[in-house]
């Protein structure tokens, strides 16, 4: 009888142990199973979003997919031996929001597929775009050129100095100035020579530069802020003025058109499950 009870007790203990299962933990970018580096396909949550991906000896390796709450794809990231080599971000409608390539090239898109900005890593050159697809601003380490919506140059900096673009500075009776190119006013300058407003061809504000504060603000033709920069950071917006891409010091944040923060990395990980 005692042997039977002992055997039943042993089986009960073994069942309890089995019910406990393996303890998975994602720590400092490494996946562990009962304290040992794990290998396999896993599913987990970062904040409110589900993530699926493969780990080899604890390190992320291969394709990782992150999903919105409705199940649509939010991000695809490719890892090789723990290092992320490329990333694609998506709107909820399935259109591409951003592409961060292995060679360092970057492209960001509106949800209709038109380009917002591109960065050529080889040339170390960035291009921002008007809503009609023409370049808004092209810049590199030596030169920055600003265009209106008709692809006409309204300002050019070379080595931080303004260059001659064939424009004439005209002083008005109230002490302010106008910068005229051909028959078109391309910029207005206040009497203190501190604030300059570059203009679209139809007169709307294009870029405001405040020399006293160092702030710059770019505008869509509808008057909403396209991009705003100041010391230590900048923010790039959607057409309706909502934030799309924000830089604050060393941190970067990307938002979809509904204002949802697109989470990258493995922060706030919960609900880890091994799929195979």
Residues covered by each model-derived region:
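Sec-dependent signal peptide recognition
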Residues: 2-10
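Glycine/tyrosine- and acidic-biased, solvent-exposed loop/turn segments at the edges of beta-strands
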Residues: 14-276
